[in-house]
Amino acid sequence: CNNAQGRCDGADFKKGPMTQLLIQLLEPLLGYSLADFPESFAYVSETALCAQTKATPARLQPTRGKKKGVETSYFYGNAMTLGRMAFDLAAEVGDSVVAIFFRDTDGTHSSHTGLWQDKWQSVCDGFKHSDFTRGVPMLPKPKSEAWLLCLAGFNPGGTCEALEELSGNDHSPNSVKSRLDATLGRHHSADELCEWLIQHPVAVDRIDSMPSFRAFHEALISAVKNFPI
């Protein structure tokens, strides 16, 4: 946010690489580019979302069974809060709203096999609990740089699924971030990555080989289905 606040929209919203990716994915679905309508975006930071979740009255607080860990309860509760915010925003502006719940999942080799799926399901359950029907989990595995690395030409002629097994730890000698920097020739800022994506339109068929992206893309398509144009 350009206003140094936890919530912003319109001119105060500063897009990042994943927003640029989203713009490109939505254009063929909507028939127009959201880049031409910057006022269409509203942003809630992770800090602001957590604060709102904690401020929710006890009777509306999310409840999870004991078998659900603290981490997945976090995803569930914040998705529920975001869904309620989106529901209220749709009523306020008198228009349809899609809520994107974006988090890097930062998995490591020590993470149990189903952790990503647990987080994904927790976000879906949180949206469902809020009664918001256009909620979309966006959970890159292990993090968004893996999606960008795929688009940058990882494994030419092959698939990118192996990228999801890399460590999300930035201090790892073979981290996703360091590999992206190496592939692009140097470190790129968020603004530079946005510009790079504009110059290199998303190859959906290629990045769709990554299960975490495919799940997100399918959820996005479902959310905008029958969307009023």
Model regions and ranges:
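Well-ordered, non-membrane alpha-helical segments in soluble/globular domains
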Residues: D12-L22, S73-F87, S110-G126, F213
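Acidic carboxylate-rich catalytic motifs and surrounding loops in phosphoryl-/glycosyl-chemistry enzymes
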Residues: L34-L49, P137-A146, E195-A203
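Activity-critical C-terminal alpha-helical subdomain
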Residues: D104-S189
